[in-house]
Design a protein with these regions (language model features):
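N-terminal amphipathic/basic leader segments beginning at the initiator methionine
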Residues: 1-23
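Mg2+-dependent prenyl diphosphate-binding active-site environment of isoprenoid biosynthetic enzymes
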Residues: 14, 23-284, 292-302
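Short arginine-rich
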Residues: 287
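Short cytosolic juxtamembrane segments of multi-pass membrane proteins
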Residues: 305-306
Length: 306
């Protein structure tokens, strides 16, 4: 596990370097919102989404930084905007994230809202640089022939009402219900958590030149990873170590929130994590070289203790 962590740290530093290339300059009358955007982006983290994107891109034969790097930056900006909005008083009202004060605590709720809006819009502006790079890619055999246009479509769809935003909506709606069934909970996990992992890996595949069947298989693998990741999160809320997690356990129970564990029990939840993990890794193993870093990374993500 130490080998995967050292490799992940190195890859995360590479992704951070890419992100820094696209930070907006903190100037002009809009300087304050840009400061808040950059504060949020530079809060640290393992940069899992851009790391996954680049790794899939590399394994499937992608070689051009001008094509992939704008999308790496864009996916992290969208992920960060979602965290900024999640932390707001109207949502989770969190004061700390990744060991430092959240954006709304430092800049106020209004400016934090604008910072999230700014990150979402700037993400698409940055991604367009990949579209305008001038690099010629082979036609895609899906609904859209142009690969960068397809990547932009995936980015928008997985982040929006048919992806992350839709999952967040269902999650908020579920908070007010006494009973949430398994189908609704899986919908939340597939969209709120898995959709952006799907986006990361699918975009890497599309831009590398993968055919439609391969892209769809990558999507299915990423969905299984995302759901397993969230079930593991529910498990850790019951049996995790508070010091390792850096937050109190049993918070879902105290908030009377329906989780995978409350619906299916602890042992069944563990079995489903193992099953989903194996299914995802079996799919990814068809990609040459995936056992060197990609599959160990997925295994670490799902079997983590914090």
């Amino acid at each position: 596990m130490s080998d995967i962590m050292s490799t992940l740290t190195a890859r995360a530093e590479e992704a951070e370097g890419v992100l820094k290339k696209y930070l907006p300059a903190e100037t002009g009358y809009q300087k304050k919102v840009i400061e808040a955007m950059n504060y949020s982006l530079m809060a640290g983290g393992k940069r899992i989404r851009p790391v996954l994107m680049r790794e899939v891109y590399r394994l499937l034969g992608g070689k051009d930084a001008a094509v992939i790097e704008p999308f790496m930056a864009a996916i992290e900006m969208i992920h960060t905007y979602s965290l900024v909005h999640d932390d707001l008083p109207a949502m989770d009202n969190d004061e700390y994230r990744r060991g430092r004060k959240t954006t709304h605590i430092v800049y106020g709720a209004g400016m934090a809202t604008l910072a999230g809006d700014g990150l979402l819009n700037y993400a698409y502006e940055v991604a367009m640089k990949g579209f305008l790079s001038g690099v010629k890619l082979p036609p895609y055999d899906g609904e859209i022939a142009d690969r960068t246009a397809m990547a932009l479509t995936i980015l928008a769809e997985k982040a929006g009402i048919y992806g992350m935003v839709g999952g967040q909506c269902a999650d908020i709606e579920a908070e007010g219900k006494k009973e949430v069934d398994s189908a609704e909970l899986i919908f939340i996990h597939e969209n709120k958590t898995a959709a952006m992992l799907e986006s990361s890996m699918m975009i890497g595949a599309v831009l590398a030149g993968a055919d439609k069947a391969q892209v769809l298989e990558v999507e299915q693998a990423a969905r299984k990873i995302g759901v397993a990741f969230q079930i593991q999160d529910d498990i850790l809320d019951v049996i995790g170590d508070e010091k390792e997690l850096g937050k109190p356990i049993l918070s879902d129970e105290k908030n009377e929130k329906t989780t995978y564990v409350t619906l299916h029990g602890l042992e069944e939840s563990k079995k489903d994590v193992e099953r989903l993990s194996k299914e995802a890794e079996d799919m990814l193993s068809k990609i040459d070289g995936s056992r060197e870093f990609l599959i160990p990374l997925v295994d670490w993500m799902i079997s983590r203790n914090k």
